[in-house]
């Protein structure tokens, strides 16, 4: 790369990076500005989501009251932007409103201390008290007729309750995307409550929304963790890699501009600034569609959709085709004598260009692998550019990439073979045993949830052709392991988990993969109560029954970490036969009591407990 070319790219990149696509004049009243931009319906929905994500224990009616008060105030400011308090920041307005909740101290304890602080510390304090695992009752789906009646009686309240229940259980759910889910939720009820067979129409749609919603929440949680724990630079690196894969024909300056704006949008949402976030996301979608010719040939269909569908579609759009005849990367990043000069001039720009060029050539790599390669390249340049002969030092840097690429390839190949051999449930069990032995201090419910989700990588990704397996699998595993990290951070019990979670975002999965059996772990004392079951297990769904059995499996491993696969399989086979036998018995409870004692004794003997 000629030096003059690099300088011109640097200028383009820097101006795009600092400018982005959002160019707004200052407004007298921020709340009036957002109300006008978003419209009353979206404004109210976003304020409800914001309050429910902060005050997760408050009753629905209390939140509706707060939302109505904020909405009426916003309307006052729309009518007269110079009216009293209309010039206050949104953080100040929302924080003041949260602090009026009478039961704040009683319900949230030390979170009430946030109200003594000034902005921006007050908002930071509220953010720190968001709970990823709130103590809320499990959502139980009512009968279809009951739901349809509630929908017809008061559609607005019905949909608000949906937003409220999801938002308070998922305090980092991407707010504009939750509006998209609510729109689909409404469409499902509108269609299916008029159908001849309401249940056959509605239930599959609700199951699909639930599963997609959980996945969306987990993906956004990783983005927020990236920003909160590793900073804006880490998020921008992720975004450069992902957008370069998705839009390989776009120029580097264009990708840089999109990265800047995407970072702003997600920073706002992760920071609780939901009105700004939704407004800026809409602007970003508008910009992408207006400039789709220079971004991607795959955007046409997305850009014809209404706003919420459009933004969702753009976020999920398939990768564009790679440009033909891209030159070798080695010329600019290894063979050139100007590498150290370019790197010293603007390190992040040069590394950003490396990541862009590498990612657009490798849609078959996971984003985290691309970031590992960029990190290795950066480390090599840091060392070599200070050496006597820099070029000689970094000449073989691409050779260092080979083991980094082969490690996830081999791991995915082995695990997909295991998945195909075992099927999802038994594959989950293999992962349960593996992870319980690695980090036995982690709570049993967390180990079960995380291992079940890790196990879904098989059915989600192993069916893909080789070229799509790694981006599917490794980036999915990053999302699931972040759930473990987030839950563990709240109540840390394992130094090994803390180390893997905090040292490097992109090396989390290799760190967990490399963990061996924890030899320092002192096995739990055997407790027969843990393995006592009752007739109610017979009425559980297949999924709930699996979770019961997997909970028992984790407990067995915690009692006997050195148990062999054969020993554990024998005990679990006996357990499955025991449940099947007693669920068929006339007197189920007696069967569970009598046969259960025999099973516990036989299991203890088999495992030498």
Swiss-Prot record:
> A cellular component term (GO) from this record?
endoplasmic reticulum
Sites binding Ca(2+) 1 sit at 30, 268, 273, 276
Q: What is the effect of changing residue 382 to K?
A: In Coari I/Porto Alegre
| Consequence of changing residue 24 to P | In Takefu/Honolulu-1
Q: Which residues carry this modification: Phosphoserine?
A: 29, 82, 89, 297, 443, 513
Residues modified as N6-succinyllysine: 229, 460, 543, 588
| Residues reported in the UniProt entry to bind (4Z,15Z)-bilirubin IXalpha | 264
Record-listed Ca(2+) 2 binding positions: 37, 279, 283
The outcome of changing residue 87 to N is: In Malmo-95/Dalakarlia
The record gives the effect of mutating residue 337 to N as: In Canterbury/New Guinea/Tagliacozzo/Cuneo/Cooperstown
**What are the annotated disulfide bridges?**
77-86, 99-115, 114-125, 148-193, 192-201, 224-270, 269-277, 289-303, 302-313, 340-385, 384-393, 416-462, 461-472, 485-501, 500-511, 538-583, 582-591
Entry comment describing in which tissues the protein is expressed: Plasma.
Sites bearing N6-methyllysine, chain numbering: 558
Presence of the UniProt keyword Coiled coil in the record:
no
**UniProt main location, coarse:** secreted
Phenotypic consequence of residue 584 to E: In Church bay
Its Gene Ontology biological processes?
A: cellular response to calcium ion starvation; cellular response to starvation; negative regulation of mitochondrial depolarization
A Pfam family per the record:
Serum_albumin
Binding-site residues, Zn(2+): 91, 271, 273
Q: What is the effect of changing residue 597 to E?
A: In Gent/Milano Fast
Q: Which residues form the propeptide?
A: 19-24
The protein's PTM annotation reads: Glycated in diabetic patients. Phosphorylated by FAM20C in the extracellular medium.
Q: In UniProt terms, what function does this protein have?
A: Binds water, Ca(2+), Na(+), K(+), fatty acids, hormones, bilirubin and drugs. Its main function is the regulation of the colloidal osmotic pressure of blood. Major zinc transporter in plasma, typically binds about 80% of all plasma zinc. Major calcium and magnesium transporter in plasma, binds approximately 45% of circulating calcium and magnesium in plasma. Potentially has more than two calcium-binding sites and might additionally bind calcium in a non-specific manner.
Which disease does the record tie it to?
Hyperthyroxinemia, familial dysalbuminemic: A disorder characterized by abnormally elevated levels of total serum thyroxine (T4) in euthyroid patients. It is due to abnormal serum albumin that binds T4 with enhanced affinity. Analbuminemia: A rare autosomal recessive disorder manifested by the presence of a very low amount of circulating serum albumin. Affected individuals manifest mild edema, hypotension, fatigue, and, occasionally, lower body lipodystrophy (mainly in adult females). The most common biochemical finding is hyperlipidemia, with a significant increase in the total and LDL cholesterol concentrations, but normal concentrations of HDL cholesterol and triglycerides.
Q: What is this protein called?
A: Albumin
């Amino acid at each position: 790369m000629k030096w003059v070319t690099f300088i011109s790219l640097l200028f383009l990149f820097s101006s795009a990076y600092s400018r982005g696509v959002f160019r707004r004049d200052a407004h007298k009243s921020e709340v009036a500005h957002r109300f006008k931009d978003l419209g009353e319906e979206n404004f109210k929905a976003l304020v409800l989501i914001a309050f429910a994500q902060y005050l997760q224990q408050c009753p629905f009616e209390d939140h509706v009251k707060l939302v109505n008060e904020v909405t009426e105030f916003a309307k006052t400011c729309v009518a007269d932007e110079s009216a009293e308090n209309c010039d206050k920041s949104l953080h100040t307005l929302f924080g003041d409103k949260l602090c009026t909740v009478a039961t704040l101290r009683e319900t949230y304890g030390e979170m009430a201390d946030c109200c003594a602080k000034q902005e921006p510390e007050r908002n930071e304090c509220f953010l720190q008290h968001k709970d990823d695992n709130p103590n809320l009752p499990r959502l139980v789906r009512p009968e279809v007729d009951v739901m349809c009646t509630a929908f017809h009686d008061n559609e607005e309240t019905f949909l608000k309750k949906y937003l409220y229940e999801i938002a308070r259980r998922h305090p980092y759910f991407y707010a504009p995307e939750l509006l998209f889910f609510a729109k689909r939720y409404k469409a499902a009820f509108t269609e299916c409550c008029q159908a001849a067979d309401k249940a056959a129409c509605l239930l599959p749609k609700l199951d699909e929304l639930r599963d997609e919603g959980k996945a969306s929440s987990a993906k956004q949680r990783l983005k927020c963790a990236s920003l909160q724990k590793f900073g804006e630079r880490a998020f921008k690196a992720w975004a450069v890699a992902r957008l370069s894969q998705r839009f390989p024909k776009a120029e580097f300056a264009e990708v840089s501009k999109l990265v800047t704006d995407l970072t702003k949008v997600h920073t706002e949402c992760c920071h609780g600034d939901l009105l700004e976030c939704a407004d800026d996301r809409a602007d970003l979608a508008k910009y992408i569609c207006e400039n789709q010719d220079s971004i991607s040939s795959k955007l046409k269909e997305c850009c014809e959709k209404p706003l919420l569908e459009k933004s969702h579609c753009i976020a999920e759009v398939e990768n564009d085709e790679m440009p033909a005849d891209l030159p070798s990367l080695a010329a600019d990043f290894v063979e050139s004598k100007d590498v150290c000069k370019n790197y010293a001039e603007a390190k992040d720009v040069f590394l950003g260009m490396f990541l862009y060029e590498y990612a657009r050539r490798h849609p078959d790599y996971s984003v985290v692998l691309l970031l590992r390669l960029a990190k290795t390249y950066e480390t090599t340049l840091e060392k070599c550019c200070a050496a006597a002969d820099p070029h000689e030092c970094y000449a073989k840097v691409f050779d260092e990439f080979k083991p980094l690429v082969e490690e996830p390839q081999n791991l995915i190949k082995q695990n997909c073979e295991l998945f195909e051999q075992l099927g999802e449930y038994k594959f989950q069990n293999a992962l349960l045993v593996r992870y319980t032995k690695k980090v036995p201090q982690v709570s049993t419910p967390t180990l079960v949830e995380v291992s079940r989700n890790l196990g879904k990588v098989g059915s989600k990704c192993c069916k893909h052709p080789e070229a799509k397996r790694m981006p599917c699998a490794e980036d999915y595993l990053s999302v699931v392991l972040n759930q473990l990290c987030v839950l563990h951070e709240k109540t840390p019990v394992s130094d090994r988990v803390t180390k893997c979670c905090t040292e490097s975002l992109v090396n989390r999965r290799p760190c967990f993969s490399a963990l061996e059996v924890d030899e320092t772990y002192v096995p739990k004392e055997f407790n027969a109560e843990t393995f006592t079951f009752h007739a109610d297990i017979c009425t559980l769904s297949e999924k709930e029954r699996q979770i019961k059995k997997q909970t028992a499996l984790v407990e067995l491993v915690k009692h006997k970490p050195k148990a062999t696969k054969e020993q554990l399989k024998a005990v679990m086979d006996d357990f499955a036969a025991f449940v099947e036998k007693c669920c068929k018995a006339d007197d189920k409870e007696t069967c569970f009591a009598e046969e259960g004692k025999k099973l516990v004794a036989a299991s203890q003997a088999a495992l030498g407990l």
